[in-house]
């Protein structure tokens, strides 16, 4: 079987499938996985508790969040727990790739998927290297604009935001590690601007609907606007990141007898917060369980469990919140909303948004409890 895309979703799925005795080919267009990273890499507490993450691939824990209004009025939130850790994603990808290789996964870098054909239940993949490969099953982990999804005639993402960020060393921010989130409809229409600072590494970024702003220009303006909040005078930019983030929720039709989708290709991102790493890990683990059973039994009924309809029910409120967020383009309305959140009775709502443990439905944990893999 073949997985297209070696981001977090593809790597997680591959390293769970190979130990089941399956012959797994992992294909990615990049030469090395520490190149052209797209995600900020913020892991939430539930992921850190439920999955065995290599500690040396994670930054220091974060339990403080500051939410800023358009006028930079702030709301401070503090959790009793270590809520977030920023992944060193290049290092994490390479570590997970080593797990895959040690488990027998075949690795094909610097290669793009072009198309496939089906004949008598067998798939033939055409790759950019000019070669063709026969495979039993195809998994698309190839991002928000998935070519695999299109060719499998599965559902495609229709709504996304775009994010752009700078990764810095040497930024100075007073106090403990924290996430700073900025509501500003000009710099981040429909989403937020952010500073993720763990005391070692700093991510400064903006996100929003691509038709409403220029991410590069917005990022530069945001950097100048926060000069009184974070000292960047001696900061060294070590990396820039950018990418599409699907925000339409988990897609309904994400599997058939030929292949299935995981990660961003499946829309496995929170519609409200645009956080995708926890859904990615859980959906990939579930996919590995379903594919293993399907290929061992040949029973297509097994695939019915892998339906986006089951997951979307959990996200109804977040889908509505996403629609509301997409329409909030007046700074005055956002300023009023932030003022309300600063009231004690409503600050609990903000606390729940940032620190709540909601993720994919519990059915995923019951059907596919993630296997711990030693690091």
Question: For the regions a protein language model found, what residue spans apply to each?
Answer:
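Conserved N-terminal helical subregion
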Residues: 60-61, 66-151, 159-161
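Glycine-rich FAD pyrophosphate-binding loop
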Residues: 15-38
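Residue-level detector of alpha-helix initiation sites
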Residues: 7-8, 143, 278
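FAD/FMN-dependent oxidoreductases across multiple families
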Residues: 113-115, 210-291
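Conserved FAD-binding catalytic core of PHBH/FMO-like flavoproteins
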Residues: 145-221
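Beta1/beta-strand and adjacent pyrophosphate-binding region of the FAD-binding site
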Residues: 1-9
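N-terminal FAD cofactor-binding segment of flavoenzymes
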Residues: 33-66
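C-terminal helical "tail/cap" subdomain of flavin- and related membrane-associated enzymes
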Residues: 289-375
């Amino acid at each position: 079987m073949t997985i297209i895309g070696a981001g977090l979703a593809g790597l997680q799925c591959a390293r769970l499938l190979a130990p089941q005795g399956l012959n797994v080919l992992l294909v990615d267009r990049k030469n090395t996985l520490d190149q052209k990273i797209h995600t900020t890499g913020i892991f939430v507490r539930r992921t850190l508790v439920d999955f065995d993450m290599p500690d040396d691939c994670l930054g220091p824990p974060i339990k403080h969040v500051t939410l800023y209004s358009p006028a930079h009025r702030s709301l401070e939130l503090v959790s009793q727990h270590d809520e977030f850790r920023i992944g060193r994603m290049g290092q994490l990808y390479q570590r997970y790739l080593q797990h895959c290789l040690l488990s027998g996964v075949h690795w094909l870098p610097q290669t793009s998927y072009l198309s496939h054909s089906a004949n008598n239940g067998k798939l033939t993949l055409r790759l950019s290297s000019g070669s063709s490969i026969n495979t039993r099953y195809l998994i698309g982990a190839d991002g928000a604009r998935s070519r695999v999804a299109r060719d499998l005639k599965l559902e495609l993402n229709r709504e996304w935001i775009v994010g752009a960020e700078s990764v810095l060393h040497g930024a100075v921010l007073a106090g403990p590690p924290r996430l700073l989130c900025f509501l500003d409809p000009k710099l981040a229409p429909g989403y937020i601007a952010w500073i993720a600072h763990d005391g070692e590494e700093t991510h400064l970024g903006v996100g929003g609907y691509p038709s409403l702003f220029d991410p590069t220009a917005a990022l530069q303006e945001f950097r100048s606007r926060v000069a009184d909040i974070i000292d960047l005078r001696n900061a060294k930019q070590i990396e820039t990141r950018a990418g599409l983030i699907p925000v339409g929720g988990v897609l309904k039709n994400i599997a058939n007898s030929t292949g299935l989708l995981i990660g961003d290709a499946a829309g496995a991102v929170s519609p409200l917060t645009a956080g995708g790493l926890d859904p990615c890990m859980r959906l990939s683990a579930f996919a590995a369980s379903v594919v293993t059973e399907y290929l061992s039994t040949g029973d297509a009924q097994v695939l019915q469990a892998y339906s986006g309809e089951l997951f979307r029910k959990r996200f109804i409120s977040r889908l509505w919140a996403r629609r509301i967020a997409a329409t909030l383009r007046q700074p005055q309305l956002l300023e009023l909303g932030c003022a309300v959140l600063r009231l004690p009775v409503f600050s609990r709502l903000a606390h729940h948004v940032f620190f709540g443990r909601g993720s994919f439905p519990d059915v995923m944990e019951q059907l596919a409890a993630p296997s711990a893999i030693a690091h």
